[in-house]
Amino acid sequence: MAEYTPKERLYRALRKQQVDRMPAVCFTQTATVEQMEACGAYWPEAHSDAEKMATLAEAAHTVVGFEAVRVPFDITAEAEFFGCGIKAGDLKQQPSVIKPSVKNLEDLEKLKNYNLKEGRIAVVLEAVKILSEKYGKELPIIGSMIGPFSLAQHINGDAWFGNLFTGEEVVPALLDFCSDFNVAYAKAMVENGADTIAIIDPTASYELIGGEFYEKYALPYQKKIVDAMKELDVATVLHICGNTTNGLGIMDKTGVNGISVDQKVDIKTATGSVKNAIIVGNLDPVAVLWNGTPEEIAEASKKALDAGVGLLTVGCGTVSMTPTVNLQKMIECAKSHTY
């Protein structure tokens, strides 16, 4: 069988086409302190400086060995773009949302004339362009964004779930607004060189909202992004935290190429629950990859591979203190696997 470039290999693997071996990639947060020290680009500055963001993203490939580059490193850029208060984080901690920006439809109306060439959204788009110009012919360029359900929750704050359960009119309005933004943002990423879009939608977890609410308030809005990317022949991967086992069949209806699952999900059960997507994951980022030994990582990797995982990788965002050697052991296991 012919050998493929990493870009070709991931393109084919995400579309269930034959490849020479498993790609070694990560669709969730990739940065670690060891990478920061190696490349000289550090959090929190790398969240808001395109050159530093690209440099740190590049380190996941040049220092660790992932066969792709991915930006950004957090899921707050979108909320900040729409006026939410943000705690900046530090060398080890990602930024977090501390203040919402929308209480009602009037507040939402004020956000509608946005410009993707402003704020941290513009920074991420510029980082995508930098990475694409350097690596786009050889490596997958993964553009990541928060999903519409979780973005709506960030923007609406603590009131979100109450509004959801009481059927307030701000809920569908916010979801329409957020998903339309997601589509525009994803298209801009693709224009700047991204070939794969990761949708990170943690609060749309089956554990939190159940199947009925997921089908009504998450599925159609996630699918809007996926459909737009399919028109551009751009692959999508959806990550939702928690034990999503009972919701995987519904998540598969989004049409994504890959469903990323965390360590709570049984891989064998997961692969039997979906018909269209491949299952991505699901090494425990804390117990295994951060605190485990290379031998324990090899054992956990073998278990996931034997269970039929489509792409072996981190089960959620990489912990910033994860040792490089541990990530490299997982990468070694992925690259040694043939389908």
From Swiss-Prot:
<comment type="subunit">
    <text>Copurifies with MtbC.</text>
</comment>
<keyword id="KW-0479">Metal-binding</keyword>
<dbReference type="GO" id="GO:0046872">
    <property type="term" value="F:metal ion binding"/>
</dbReference>
<comment type="pathway">
    <text>One-carbon metabolism; methanogenesis from methylated amine.</text>
</comment>
<keyword id="KW-0489">Methyltransferase</keyword>
<dbReference type="GO" id="GO:0006730">
    <property type="term" value="P:one-carbon metabolic process"/>
</dbReference>
<dbReference type="InterPro" id="IPR052024">
    <property type="entry name" value="Methanogen_methyltrans"/>
</dbReference>
<dbReference type="GO" id="GO:0043791">
    <property type="term" value="F:dimethylamine methyltransferase activity"/>
</dbReference>
<comment type="function">
    <text>Methyltransferase involved in methanogenesis from methylamines methanol pathway. Catalyzes the transfer of the methyl group from the methylated corrinoid protein MtmC (MtmC1 or MtmC2) or MtbC to coenzyme M, forming the substrate for coenzyme-B sulfoethylthiotransferase.</text>
</comment>
<dbReference type="InterPro" id="IPR038071">
    <property type="entry name" value="UROD/MetE-like_sf"/>
</dbReference>
<feature type="binding site">
    <location>
        <position position="241"/>
    </location>
    <ligand>
        <name>Zn(2+)</name>
    </ligand>
</feature>
<dbReference type="InterPro" id="IPR006360">
    <property type="entry name" value="Mtase_MtaA_CmuA"/>
</dbReference>
<keyword id="KW-0808">Transferase</keyword>
<dbReference type="GO" id="GO:0043833">
    <property type="term" value="F:[methyl-Co(III) methylamine-specific corrinoid protein]:coenzyme M methyltransferase activity"/>
</dbReference>
<comment type="similarity">
    <text>Belongs to the uroporphyrinogen decarboxylase family. MtbA/MtaA subfamily.</text>
</comment>
<feature type="binding site">
    <location>
        <position position="316"/>
    </location>
    <ligand>
        <name>Zn(2+)</name>
    </ligand>
</feature>
<dbReference type="Pfam" id="PF01208">
    <property type="entry name" value="URO-D"/>
</dbReference>
<dbReference type="GO" id="GO:0006779">
    <property type="term" value="P:porphyrin-containing compound biosynthetic process"/>
</dbReference>
<dbReference type="GO" id="GO:0032259">
    <property type="term" value="P:methylation"/>
</dbReference>
<feature type="binding site">
    <location>
        <position position="239"/>
    </location>
    <ligand>
        <name>Zn(2+)</name>
    </ligand>
</feature>
<keyword id="KW-0484">Methanogenesis</keyword>
<dbReference type="InterPro" id="IPR048096">
    <property type="entry name" value="Methylcob_mtaseMtbA"/>
</dbReference>
<dbReference type="InterPro" id="IPR000257">
    <property type="entry name" value="Uroporphyrinogen_deCOase"/>
</dbReference>
<keyword id="KW-0862">Zinc</keyword>
<dbReference type="GO" id="GO:0004853">
    <property type="term" value="F:uroporphyrinogen decarboxylase activity"/>
</dbReference>
<dbReference type="GO" id="GO:2001129">
    <property type="term" value="P:methane biosynthetic process from dimethylamine"/>
</dbReference>
<protein>
    <recommendedName>
        <fullName>Methylcobamide:CoM methyltransferase MtbA</fullName>
        <ecNumber>2.1.1.247</ecNumber>
    </recommendedName>
</protein>
